[in-house]
Amino acid sequence: MRGPRRFRLWTRANVLTVISILTSILSGAGCSPLSQLPSDNPAHVGVQDGVTTERVDRSKNHRNTTASSGAHRVTSGEPLGDRVTTRSTTAPDQVPGDASRNTTMAGTKCSLQVDLSTFACPADCQCNATSEGMVVSCVTPDTLREFPVIAREVARAVIKLELRGQSKLTSLKTELKFFTCLKHLTIENCGLNNIQGIAFKTLTSLETINLRHNHLTEFPQELLRTLNLRELWLEGNALTCSCTNLWLRSVDVAADRSEMTCSTRDGVSKMKMTQFKCEPCGIPDIRNMTLVFEPKNGMFLLRFVISGCPKPKIDLLRNHHHVLRSGSSQFKLTDFKSEFNGQVVTGTITILPHMETSQTTYVLTAVNSKGQANQTFHLYDQTTPASSIHIPLSNIPPRISSATTPRASPTEDFGPQTQVILPVVGVVILLISAVFIIYLCQRAKHRSHARQRCKKALLDKKFNEFQEGVPLTGLQLVDNPNYNLTKKKHVATTCPKTVRLQTILLMRVIGEGAFGRVFLGTCAHLIQKNEFAIVAVKTLKGSCSDSLKRDFEREAEMLATIEHANIVTFYGVCTESDQWMMIFEFMENGDLNKYLRMHGPDAAFLKDRDSMDSDEGQLTREQLMKIVLQIASAMEYLALQHFVHRDLATRNCLVGCDLVVKLGDFGMSRDVYTTDYYRVEGTAMLPVRWMPPESIIYRTFTTESDVWSFGVTLWEVFTYGKQPWFEYSNSEVIEHIKNSRTLKRPPRTCTDGVYRVMQGCWKPNPQDRLTMKDIAELLREEVSGDPVYIDIIA
């Protein structure tokens, strides 16, 4: 604890230093906090290089039109949710309201005088003519199913329109486009829940909008872009805490602003609008994108963080073709999450490389109603980088906005104070990053010491001399671990159990591999005190390389985390001599392949007189199903633990008494079953007859490749141990597998259901294959529904 405590004290001192530096920089630059920036102009929140900034919208479109939404003020004494008063932003020499009205009314003819004798008022509505224009009022409850239809020439004369108590009126689209002289609009206590973006586009004379007590959840600022509005009433609507509504809190009276509330997305709770934080608003922004290649499954993982409001839609283009929308199994979107009320989306796109050698262009796109963002990258489909490929944020091109939402130039987006603040924030981020990196280094060093202590307790003891009478042969093959430990969310908290050397007695050699030999032996006090247990002892040559020793350590640590009824029990390790040992459960009937052959239709030609009792006959279908169910159960467990076996076959399964079958490979099968392995293009010996196309081509092993191997193992069991593709050479087998050919159905004992499981394991696309969980369930159903056959011919 001395080291971590000293580091914490050092970190506190550095944090104080960072704060003092930041204070001096801020005071020297004369900066004010972001909250004190001028708010006279409409603003939206944007994200640039991961730093949230408030951008003042000064685009040319907004300067040249007086129909700006302006800065929003709450009249003193009125609740903010009740009335929002807006004032237009005009040039200094203009009178607010007059000049803008002249501009917006240019080219618009208002027919203020209407001949009522030729005008038919809409049913259930009242129409009155005044000196200023027509007033239309529809207040009889639930009499309108749609917006009242008024002739175009009459609509131009309407200055006031009232709709109240119309619960069936749910949307507002383009029904108001001819009401060009409308000044006061009231839609109150209706069922209105949706307003289209162009609903108010032509209402350039509109002064007040009353939308009280409707069902609106969002009211975008874009609805008022073409208006010179003075009052907006939104009381009684269930406005959500979203970026779309964030502009409503941009008011000048802080006391009234604090009273405005919004509902969360679930509608259960409410919060003050001033407390709601919506970091990213506006056009989609690809804030971060990382491309990672995973050798274990031969796939690229494209991880992204994208912001935008409304929530952007994600797609991936490959050579200008949409691959996510098309539903292609070679491209899948996983881990898709949304944060900040749906305004930040994260996810991973899985890319399975194609059999191509030319460069392929990919484009990640994010689209919403405000615009689109693209990021392009290139891949050679046969490229297999050794480490992650990071695409830095600085390489991401500018956003591409839509035509309806123009972007200002960088000089127009940022005020002088913001330009000063950004470098300051950058300096702060650099300092914090430095402190964080130092903390990670110290933490990694602490973990390394802890691991070394564990290894020292396990492997670095001083030992007595131990000599075994049987010499070990030279290293013949480079042996790969038959189980592959993938990255897991948890780390084993205990070291493998240590077995004392004096409790082990080696009896005879039962196998040999590249690492050394496997002995039949006994071990005292292993399972119970004062009792001997028969065990299998896997030894490591004393003169082996450091890499084999590291593999031995990793395998021991991995095996210590596995515990299943159909996996050979790992008891522990012994490192008290030059010959390191692993102690396993002993399975008296040997490997499953030999057992199947000795209990199959050709057993009479294979067995020796003394090797087996004469009364043991051929295995029945029920016994074969019992065998495959046990293998499936073990593989289902490994898949759930994220372990990849990589060499599943009957030769690597062991048989005990009462037909108990367990997974257990001591690495000796490559010497015993030499014809099952083939050296491909100078690589290590590979079991190509059990491997799927992606493993042969890309040398990648995944849980899906284990599923393929299980299908071949299933075929082995129901053919009583025959070698897959026994009629072809290894090179011919590779061509058959690449061309999507599969093994023929085994005769007699294999049911239709079992063969369908085999076919489900041999799908060319890994994502289309059955999972081990599905396989286990299908086989259990096959057993429960399998009729019992009686041999009446014999």
Curated annotation (Swiss-Prot):
Gene Ontology BP term (one): cell differentiation
Main localization of the protein described in the UniProt heading: membrane
This protein's GO CC annotations: axon; plasma membrane; receptor complex
SUPFAM superfamilies: L domain-like, Protein kinase-like (PK-like)
The LRR repeat ranges on this chain: 181-202, 205-226
Signal peptide range in chain numbering: 1-33
Residues covered by the LRRCT domain: 237-280
Residue spans, topological domain Cytoplasmic: 441-794
Ranges annotated as spanning the membrane: 420-440
Protein EC: 2.7.10.1
Intervals, Extracellular compartment: 34-419
InterPro entries in UniProt: Ig-like_fold, Kinase-like_dom_sf, Leu-rich_rpt, LRR_dom_sf, Prot_kinase_dom, Protein_kinase_ATP_BS, RTK, Ser-Thr/Tyr_kinase_cat_dom
Expression tissues: Expression is confined to the central nervous system and its associated endocrine tissues.
Binding residues for ATP: 510-518, 538
Keyword field contains Glycoprotein: yes
Record-annotated Protein kinase domain positions: 504-775
Keyword field contains Lyase: no
Residues with glycosylation annotation: 64, 102, 128, 288, 374
Active-site residue numbers: 647 (proton acceptor)
Location of region: Disordered: 36-102
Catalytic reactions of this protein: L-tyrosyl-[protein] + ATP = O-phospho-L-tyrosyl-[protein] + ADP + H(+)
Membrane topology: Single-pass type I membrane protein
Compartment(s) where it occurs, according to its Swiss-Prot or TrEMBL record: Membrane
Function: May bind an endogenous invertebrate neurotrophin. Binds human NT-3, but not NGF or BDNF.
Protein name in UniProt: Putative neurotrophin receptor LTRK 1
Species for this entry: Lymnaea stagnalis (Great pond snail)
Classification lineage: Eukaryota, Metazoa, Spiralia, Lophotrochozoa, Mollusca
